[in-house]
Amino acid sequence: MNDARAESREHYVDADTPSAARMYDYLLGGHYNYPCDREACDQLLLTAPSTRELALNNRAFLERVVRHIARRYGIRQFLDHGSGLPTQNNVHQVAQSVDPASKVVYIDNDPLVLGYGRAFLEENRNVLILPSDMRETAAIAADAARIIDFSRPVAALFVSVLHCVPDDDRGNPRRMVEDTVRLLAPGSVVVICQLVSEDARIRDAVTELMREQTGNRWGRVRTEAEVAELFTVPRLRIEEEVGLLDVTDWRPDTDLVRRQATQEWIEFGGLATVD
């Protein structure tokens, strides 16, 4: 009975309450969203007009960082926390363009993400999607071990997701990063970035709006210093060549970058290796 209830919750899509995953999909120009998500984005754009450019830049960063990890560090195993809806150049596509044997575990608990993700990935044996709350690190590791060998280097991605996590006893961002790093072998990497603003009015306004729109399924906009503090978790060593910065400027390559006309908030973070 409990399994049946869990499965029912997993497949139930609330089309009347915006979800962060569907809002992000809309900002990227996707089609996996509902009127409520589009209306919520319209409200968000009134407060932070550069949000669409921010979302596009963040997606380009995700592609760059996965490609960099695969080429420079030779890592072939990826954990993508809060993976979101499938779009172009997903993590497994970028990683497998470097090495087709690369393995990717997507972690999300949005029912629409799970539905479309499974349909999209059912033919790829090196990809697994887990219907998990990303704060449940131990359970995720146990399930991910079906295709991930934790005795070898893994890339743990927390890209544009920790702002969805509240600062509570169940699993605040630092605890999530700490718990994940404990699982990782030396030579692994961790990527962290989240939405930040140095303007307290923007932080408060966007946080309040997103909590209201998503039915309180949101954490908060943080400061650059708070994100930098996540990189002080034991065993993490920031990649010194680049450091922490607006991810639009993280190792820019031939990808076209559409600059934010205004910068009410940015996506801030970087990459760290695991000692």
Locate predicted features:
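Rossmann-like AdoMet
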Residues: 1-132, 137-138, 145-150
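Conserved S-adenosyl-L-methionine
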Residues: 24, 235-254
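A short SAM/SAH-binding and catalytic strip from SAM-dependent methyltransferases
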Residues: 134-135, 144-174, 180
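Conserved beta-strand signature within the Rossmann-like core of class I S-adenosyl-L-methionine
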Residues: 155-158, 176-177, 183-195
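Anion-recognition interface
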Residues: 170, 197, 203-204
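Short, glycine-/aromatic-enriched active-site segment of Class I SAM-dependent methyltransferases
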Residues: 201-215
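Short alpha-helix
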Residues: 217-243
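Core SAM-dependent methyltransferase catalytic element
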Residues: 251-275
